[in-house]
């Protein structure tokens, strides 16, 4: 077991994510000796970032929820901040996966442990796929690498069979950062070389207790590293009781004014305030989180992380078990499209909105195609935090 320091990781993940050309020359950063903390740069250091490759998963479903499998690269239109982009790589479920599984092992989820232990065989049989590999990180009061990347199904299943709970902390955001660092060392597919899709699967409560990392920092780096996040939410009573409630207080200030001061360097609007308070549109909350990466974000972090990277969040409730959720995630991963492009014609800094649409020729003569639903990652943010 390798214990991962609570500091670290963000700069390593960011530099690898934003320079895919380097990945062809090296297998990744030199691993530190066990127990050696990675040196952190100053907190106020400015980060210079250039994004040379963007990947987005694309899921297309009809009005009954069935996935559409008949589309090709020419059927998709991609824009980055409104500027059309040229597709460099297109795939439909064929690129092998590099998967990092984050498993909460706090005492808070002890009652779920028998169900979580059964997840290993599902991950190897339905999620990894042919030529897939997986690594496992457990987290509670600490973040531990339980298994490095391996193709060996027996090793992965053994880790799940021997999971044990620890303290009551849930360092979710630190664990996300550690997982992003692992995935950032894996080569991405381009137009002229094969690569791997970077996927993170989180099995946890929608709660963070004790992380040194903020949610927005982890999400921003996941986006820049082209990591797609799927999450299986463990619905514990304690998690629901400790979750920060949405702001539902009545408006007592005059119209056009706000009851609290603005965040430094920002202009207050109804949308920005709703995103900050966790009561607004999911898309606005994602944008707010990556723009204000060092500030706390309200709302369900598992849902925000999945939506912010093009993945999906499945809560365990009623008749949906952990096994059912993982099975659904595996089915989607191996039937979705993946598109890569090199951003051109847009400003480097700031938030980049990714939009995906279908060419008219793709749906010509197809009944009910106007009701098809497209899901992709909404964008990414380049530049230092605004606050």
Residue ranges: model-predicted function:
Residues 1-6:
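N-terminal secretory signal peptides that target proteins for export/translocation
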């Amino acid at each position: 077991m390798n214990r991962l320091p609570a500091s670290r990781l963000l700069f390593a993940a960011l530099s690898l994510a934003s320079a895919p050309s380097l990945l062809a020359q090296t297998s990744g950063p030199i691993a530190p000796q066990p127990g050696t903390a990675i040196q952190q740069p100053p907190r106020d250091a400015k980060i210079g970032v250039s994004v040379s490759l963007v990947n987005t998963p694309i899921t297309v479903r009809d009005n009954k929820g069935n996935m559409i499998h008949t589309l090709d690269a020419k059927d998709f239109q991609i824009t980055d901040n409104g500027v059309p982009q040229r597709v460099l790589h297109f795939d439909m479920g064929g690129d092998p996966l590099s998967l990092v599984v984050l498993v909460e092992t706090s005492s808070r989820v002890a009652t779920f442990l028998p169900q979580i232990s059964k997840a290993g065989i599902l991950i190897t049989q339905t999620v990894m796929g042919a030529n897939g590999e997986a690594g496992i990180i457990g987290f509670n009061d600490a973040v531990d690498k339980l298994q490095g990347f391996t193709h060996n199904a027996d090793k992965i299943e053994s880790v799940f069979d021997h999971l044990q709970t620890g303290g009551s902390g849930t360092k979710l955001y630190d664990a996300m950062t550690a997982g992003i660092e692992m995935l950032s060392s894996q080569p991405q597919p381009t137009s002229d070389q094969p690569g791997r899709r970077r996927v993170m699967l989180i099995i946890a409560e929608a709660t963070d207790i004790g992380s040194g990392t903020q949610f927005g920092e982890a999400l921003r780096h996941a986006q820049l590293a082209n990591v797609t996040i799927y999450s299986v939410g463990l619905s514990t009573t304690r998690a629901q009781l400790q979750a920060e409630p949405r702001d539902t207080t009545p408006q007592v200030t005059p119209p056009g004014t706000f009851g609290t001061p603005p965040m430094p360097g920002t202009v207050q609007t109804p949308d920005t305030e709703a995103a900050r308070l966790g009561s607004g549109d999911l898309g606005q909350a994602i944008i707010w989180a990556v723009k204000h990466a060092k500030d706390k974000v309200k709302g369900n972090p598992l849902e925000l992380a999945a939506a912010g990277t093009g993945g999906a969040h499945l809560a365990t409730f009623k008749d949906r078990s952990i096994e059912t959720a993982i099975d659904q995630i595996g089915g989607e991963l191996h039937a979705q499209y993946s598109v890569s492009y090199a951003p051109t014609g847009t400003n480097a800094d700031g938030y980049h909105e990714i939009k995906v649409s279908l060419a008219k020729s793709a749906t010509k003569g197809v009944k009910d195609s106007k009701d098809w639903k497209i899901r992709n990652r909404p964008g990414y943010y380049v530049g230092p935090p605004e606050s």
